[in-house]
Amino acid sequence: MFLLPLPAAARVAVRHLSVKRLWAPGPAAADMTKGLVLGIYSKEKEEDEPQFTSAGENFNKLVSGKLREILNISGPPLKAGKTRTFYGLHEDFPSVVVVGLGKKTAGIDEQENWHEGKENIRAAVAAGCRQIQDLEIPSVEVDPCGDAQAAAEGAVLGLYEYDDLKQKRKVVVSAKLHGSEDQEAWQRGVLFASGQNLARRLMETPANEMTPTKFAEIVEENLKSASIKTDVFIRPKSWIEEQEMGSFLSVAKGSEEPPVFLEIHYKGSPNASEPPLVFVGKGITFDSGGISIKAAANMDLMRADMGGAATICSAIVSAAKLDLPINIVGLAPLCENMPSGKANKPGDVVRARNGKTIQVDNTDAEGRLILADALCYAHTFNPKVIINAATLTGAMDIALGSGATGVFTNSSWLWNKLFEASIETGDRVWRMPLFEHYTRQVIDCQLADVNNIGKYRSAGACTAAAFLKEFVTHPKWAHLDIAGVMTNKDEVPYLRKGMAGRPTRTLIEFLFRFSQDSA
């Protein structure tokens, strides 16, 4: 008999089917170490029967229609993201999870600003793979569900959980494509998702483990193993001083951990002299707030205040693995923001690399201080584009929550490229204003050229972006405030609770499309 998760009435119905085992019993009968995830679509019309995917239909034929029979009596039709698990259907796959994919016709939703079909696949496959993981089965084959890249992303993202420091860990499940078609798209999805998982790991690791130096070493290890077309420079404090990065150093001086300026190069273009794209990421490996100290509640989350550095570095590692034919430079000023006798004090004035002076009225607005020097340095590479990412402001979380990354940019062309990439990945972005209205609030300063918090509490994300703009002269620059998407509670179904690693896949997709446009 089949072992089904059914109510009593349905179990009676199954017995009436007189279903027999499809293979001979015995020690060699079934490989209990492999599961299968198959997709089924919702009905387009009420009178229709739900359709399996191609892979689901083929498997149903392989078991003489039994999958359809038991699915029909096991409960109502599966809604998007829901699962049902069956056992004993085929000796190659003793455990089969059927997942609901929603409507087959689902496409780009202009109201939601994403591809609904791809998001449904990611969520459904993640749910199915977790069912296999809960059964402690170490291998799963996944139906491409009509989009092998989205299926791979759902599997790899959905199975990931940070448990590096625990003695008891979840079973590691290896996911691979069911069938031989679409292998290229599947592998691309694995790379995209693995990039986001790298960012999640960097962000989740406790701050005593993930120091500025350790962060740089992990990125170096991952980048060097990704491609031989790479260079990594872990710049010490003496180099930072030589570069006259006084704004960065003012934040770092409060901690016993030495600051590091991480500079990574991926040289994928056949033309070595081709100008690069430059990514800059905020790298505060722990943010106490400094002298303007934060409240104790949830301060532990500030181990992920280097999320900007984590996402941009992970995106570049992924670009290297994809062997994209472009040049990219990644810059990450790395330090802690701690209170001490050496720390910044409210009212201090510091000097940035471009000579501008900054009045530090709040030491908890430190991310913009380290980014100011990094953005100045970014211009030395004659870049095609400058994009920075930072968990910069709580105001961004209040404005957009976890729904989208806020993007402030001086280039509509760049905005459109990021927006298009985000529709594909489902990791959305939303354009925010860079009005002169906000610039006036940060340059109206009593003691220096600019103030690090501005005149008013209102529009904190906008005034922070206006502050950064004071250190940018490039006509194609975008600032991504990722504070609202730093963590995941239950908003993204294919990510477990914890640090989200967003918007890594959107940055990878942006680079992927840019490389195709440049070819």
UniProtKB/Swiss-Prot annotation:
Modified residues (Phosphoserine): S42, S54, S180, S194, S238
Cited PROSITE patterns: CYTOSOL_AP
UniProt-annotated binding residues for Zn(2+) 2: K282, D287, D305, E366
One Pfam family from the record: Peptidase_M17_N
Co-factor note (free text): Binds two metal ions per subunit. Two metal binding sites with different affinities are located in the enzyme active site and can be occupied in vitro by different metals: site 1 is occupied by Zn(2+), Mn(2+), Mg(2+) or Co(2+), while the tight binding site 2 can be occupied by only Zn(2+) or Co(2+). One Zn(2+) ion is tightly bound to site 2 and essential for enzyme activity in vivo, while site 1 can be occupied by different metals to give different enzymatic activities. Mn(2+) is required for Cys-Gly hydrolysis activity.
Active site residues per record: K294, R368
Reaction(s) this enzyme catalyzes, per UniProt: Release of an N-terminal amino acid, Xaa-|-Yaa-, in which Xaa is preferably Leu, but may be other amino acids including Pro although not Arg or Lys, and Yaa may be Pro. Amino acid amides and methyl esters are also readily hydrolyzed, but rates on arylamides are exceedingly low; an S-substituted L-cysteinylglycine + H2O = an S-substituted L-cysteine + glycine; L-cysteinylglycine + H2O = L-cysteine + glycine; S-benzyl-L-cysteinylglycine + H2O = S-benzyl-L-cysteine + glycine
Function noted in UniProt: Cytosolic metallopeptidase that catalyzes the removal of unsubstituted N-terminal hydrophobic amino acids from various peptides. The presence of Zn(2+) ions is essential for the peptidase activity, and the association with other cofactors can modulate the substrate spectificity of the enzyme. For instance, in the presence of Mn(2+), it displays a specific Cys-Gly hydrolyzing activity of Cys-Gly-S-conjugates. Involved in the metabolism of glutathione and in the degradation of glutathione S-conjugates, which may play a role in the control of the cell redox status.
Family: Belongs to the peptidase M17 family.
Protein's name according to its UniProt entry: Cytosol aminopeptidase
Lineage: Eukaryota, Metazoa, Chordata, Craniata, Vertebrata
